[in-house]
Amino acid sequence: MYAVIKTGGKQYTVKEGDVLKIEMLPENVGNEIKFSEVLMLVDGDKVTCGAPFVAKATVKAEVLDHGRHKKVKIIKFRRRKHHMKQMGHRQYYSQVKITAIGK
């Protein structure tokens, strides 16, 4: 059984036991969270698609960790002007483990 969930403006294909890095959530480490925005649910040959979400379907997960991704460097450059600007960005994430998929 697996599901497609939506969180943080992105879609993830998940099954029980998966560990994901998703956009930062305002939850403490060790808390259990529920994702109610389930777009699709697949159980063997039975496929349930939502319009836009599957009714009464939830995915439960446990927050394992919070952290930051590797730095992404941004360079702005103006040709022939001796001008270059460098910036960096590190996005925050939450690491979660999928514990249950249910309807």
Swiss-Prot record:
| Signal peptide coordinates | none
Cellular component aspect of the GO annotation? cytoplasm; ribonucleoprotein complex; ribosome
Keyword RNA-binding carried by entry: yes
PROSITE patterns for this protein: RIBOSOMAL_L21
Q: Which GO terms describe its biological process?
A: translation
Q: Which keywords has UniProt assigned to this entry?
A: Ribonucleoprotein, Ribosomal protein, RNA-binding, rRNA-binding
> One MF term in GO for this entry?
rRNA binding
Description of how the protein assembles with itself and partners = Part of the 50S ribosomal subunit. Contacts protein L20.
What does this chain do? This protein binds to 23S rRNA in the presence of protein L20.
Identify its protein family: Belongs to the bacterial ribosomal protein bL21 family.
Protein name from the UniProt record: Large ribosomal subunit protein bL21
The organism named in the record is Legionella pneumophila (strain Lens)
Gene responsible for this protein: rplU
